[in-house]
Amino acid sequence: MNITATILLAFGMSMDAFAASIGKGATLHKPKFSEALRTGLIFGAVETLTPLIGWGMGMLASRFVLEWNHWIAFVLLIFLGGRMIIEGFRGADDEDEQPRRRHGFWLLVTTAIATSLDAMAVGVGLAFLQVNIIATALAIGCATLIMSTLGMMVGRFIGSIIGKKAEILGGLVLIGIGVQILWTHFHG
């Protein structure tokens, strides 16, 4: 795979994380750049590892991985999105009374895993091609780092406009990504 194809693949794989990061950034009250970078680093690290894991699985048992990865991503994203929506409605009355909670490490990791399962499936496919899997995985991770950090900052702007309803919007974005993953699986 040439450098152009690798870069296009990398940024294509980062789009789910970008969308999820917009939702995350919107739910926080003015996230700092350091929080955006932390999110980008977590999403980027997970997105670097998942194609490597997928590649390894592709060498072993590609059929099982491809059969179930979309369902796993769907369930995780529906759960996380539903949780965000519930939190958004639960806190709608006391919007200015307390600052919004920060996203914990494990919540970010879970979201990153849910949005990166497609990269694992790509890794399975790459196992059957002549590619430098390390360079490709690093490119995907770097693109995701950039796009997730940018997504958090875009989300910051959106969140400052729509306030607490941003948590509901963020949950809807995650659910939308989950539905899109399932739709793509069934309708190509």
Curated annotation (Swiss-Prot):
Keywords: Cell inner membrane, Cell membrane, Ion transport, Manganese, Membrane, Transmembrane, Transmembrane helix, Transport
InterPro entries recorded: Mntp/YtaF (IPR003810), Put_MntP (IPR022929)
Lineage: Bacteria, Pseudomonadati, Pseudomonadota, Gammaproteobacteria, Enterobacterales
Cited function: Probably functions as a manganese efflux pump.
Leader sequence segment: none
Chief place where the protein resides: membrane
GO cellular component: plasma membrane
Membrane topology of the entry: Multi-pass membrane protein
Family to which the UniProt record says this protein belongs: Belongs to the MntP (TC 9.B.29) family.
Source organism of this protein record: Escherichia coli O127:H6 (strain E2348/69 / EPEC)
TM region(s), chain numbering: 3-23, 66-86, 106-128, 143-163, 168-188
Name the record gives this protein: Probable manganese efflux pump MntP
Sample GO molecular function, one term: manganese ion transmembrane transporter activity
Subcellular location: Cell inner membrane
